[in-house]
Structures are given as C-alpha cells and as structure tokens.
C-alpha cells in the first residue's frame, strides 16, 4: 500500500503544519486515531507511527505539502522545479548525474532533470532514516529507460541497490518522489 496525500496552499498557511494536518487526515482514512500521540523518533530523528505497521513521511516545497502512507519504510520528497546551480551540481552530484542533468535540451529540461535527481536523493535518505547525516555523494542515480536505479559509491567500487522502488509523479511544476521497499503489494 502506498498512498499519497497532497494539498496546495491557498493562503499564507504554514506548509509544515499543512503536512502534519495531512497526516492526521490520511491516518483517519486508515482508521488510525490521534496519530500525533503515537509518534516515536528513530536515531536520526525520523518520525514513526508506533505499533500499527503503518509508515509515513512528510515533505513540502513552494506551495505544496505532501504526506505519504505506506506499509513499508517510506521516504518522500516534493520539490518545485528549479534551475540547476553549477555549485550545487558540482558539490552534490556524481559525474553520471551531472551528465544526465546537463545532457542537452532546453533550460527547462535541465531544470526538470536536476529537480528529479534531487527529489530522488532526498526520498532515499528519508526512507533510510539517515537524512542529511548521509553524504549525498555516497550514492548516485542512473536510469534504465526512465526507471531510476540506485548505486552506492565507495572507494572499493559501485554497488547496485536492490529491494527499493521509486514512485515518481509530476505535479504542476513540481517533482514528487516516494522511495519504499519493493515488498509493497499495490499502488
């Protein structure tokens, strides 16, 4: 089970509060009452719902808040599509990722590819619970057709990661990505 809930901000409403409110709404739909009272935190601060086999993750960017519920550990990210900055690409992206981002097309195409990779990276580090304690240069994404493939990078080589899946959705100038364990039964 993977369920996405998102809301576009209509006023100056606080996006973080909107994301937590989406969690309340999503949990109610799944029969979980008072989810904020059931939250515990992992070693790197990732919040979990205690005792019901339901996992969640929150994100927000620009005018959107996102909440994802899943029956496996999940990470999500929503990012407004933005122009890539050379300093960010040079510092946080692998050579293959840089080539993918800059491989031609219009400025808008490059912005979409940059934002896609950034959202994939964020969803992965949120799924593992490591967050930004994990160096974004310690892994990279490549693509088989349009499917993202995750590789861990180390001094001893490159290792393809199996067991994870990525769900991507474009949303009104935003990239939305969810990372979850493949044992998921349905979307």
Where are each of the predicted segments found?
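Core catalytic alpha/beta fold that binds nucleotide/phospho-ligands
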Residues: 1-187
């Amino acid at each position: 089970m993977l369920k996405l809930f998102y809301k576009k901000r209509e006023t100056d409403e606080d996006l973080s509060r909107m994301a937590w409110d989406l969690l309340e709404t999503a949990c109610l739909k799944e029969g979980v009452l008072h989810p904020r009272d059931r939250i515990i935190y992992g070693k790197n601060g990732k919040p979990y719902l205690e005792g019901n086999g339901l996992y969640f993750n929150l994100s927000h960017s620009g005018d959107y808040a996102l909440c994802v519920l899943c029956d496996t550990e999940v990470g999500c990210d929503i990012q407004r599509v933005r122009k890539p900055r050379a300093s960010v690409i040079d510092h946080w992206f692998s050579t293959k990722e840089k080539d993918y981002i800059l491989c031609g097309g219009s400025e808008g195409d490059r912005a979409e590819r940059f934002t896609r990779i950034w959202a994939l990276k964020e969803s992965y580090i949120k799924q593992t619970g490591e967050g930004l304690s994990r160096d974004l240069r310690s892994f990279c994404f490549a693509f088989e057709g349009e499917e993202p493939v995750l590789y861990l990078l180390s001094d001893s080589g490159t290792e393809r990661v199996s067991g994870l899946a990525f769900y991507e959705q474009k949303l009104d100038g935003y990239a939305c990505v969810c990372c979850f364990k493949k044992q998921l039964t349905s979307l």
